[in-house]
Regions:
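N-terminal phosphate-binding loop and adjacent alpha-helix
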Residues: 29-64, 82, 92-95
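Short beta-strand segments
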Residues: 13, 69-73, 150-157
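Short acidic-glycine loop/turn motifs at beta-strand connectors
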Residues: 25-27, 79-80, 164-167
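Glycine/GP-enriched mid-protein hinge/lid loop-to-helix segment characteristic of carbohydrate kinases
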Residues: 2-8, 31-35, 42-45, 104-106, ...
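Hydrophobic "anchor" residues
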Residues: 18, 29-30, 83, 168-169
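Short beta-strand scaffold segments in enzyme catalytic cores
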Residues: 19-24, 159-163
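Asp-based phosphoryl-transfer active-site loop
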Residues: 10-17
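Glycine-rich phosphate-binding loop and adjoining helix at the ATP-binding site
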Residues: 44, 48, 67-68, 76-148
């Protein structure tokens, strides 16, 4: 889908225990993953490790990134980049943190944040398990095509994403598939 896209995007898998940073170009990871503790109970240390992680990746790049895109666990105002609420894995974000605007101001590039379960499920629906299953069905002569998927993430916490008729179910808090 994006294999010929030469733009570089910084990435982050934000877990309750660790942040894992990298960069992608096209459909390929171009920097080996770099981990830092998330320090999720101390906002200042958590934000400092976010900046350190992205800075470390940027020093390894040959070209400047055009955006930051990453997954974050739990409910949030993902459209506006505000993370907060009852997040057991990130107690320091309880009162809300404008993480997207903070990173966009610091790096001067767009920031896209989405629920981790949603990104996992949508990725599998677009270019992972779902197309693979449909291709195997087609090869075997079966005309059935699946358009629905439930993806489950397991880490420090538990998350999920739901795709129905090839559309991601976001819900009113950005995590329509999560179980609370």
């Amino acid at each position: 889908m994006y294999e010929h896209d030469k733009r570089v995007v910084l990435t982050l898998d934000a877990g309750g225990t660790n942040f894992v940073f990298s960069a992608i170009q096209g459909n390929s990871q171009i920097i080996a993953p770099i981990s830092f503790p998330s320090v999720s109970d101390n906002l200042d240390k958590c934000l400092a490790n976010l900046l350190t992680g992205f800075d470390t990746v940027m020093k390894k790049l040959e070209t400047l990134p055009v955006a930051i895109s990453f997954a974050f666990p739990g409910p949030a105002d993902y459209r506006n980049g505000v993370i907060g609420g009852n997040l057991p894995n990130f107690p320091s974000f309880r009162n809300g943190v404008a993480l997207g605007p903070f990173l966009q101001h610091h790096y001067g590039i767009p920031v896209f944040i989405e629920n981790d379960g949603n990104l996992f499920a949508y990725g599998e629906a677009l270019s992972g398990a779902l197309p693979m299953v449909n291709q195997q069905l087609s090869i075997s002569g079966n005309t059935r095509e699946y358009k629905n998927l439930l993806g489950i993430t397991l880490g420090t916490g538990f998350g999920a994403g739901v795709v129905i008729n090839n559309c991601l179910l976001n819900g009113d808090n950005g995590c329509g598939g999560d179980v609370w």
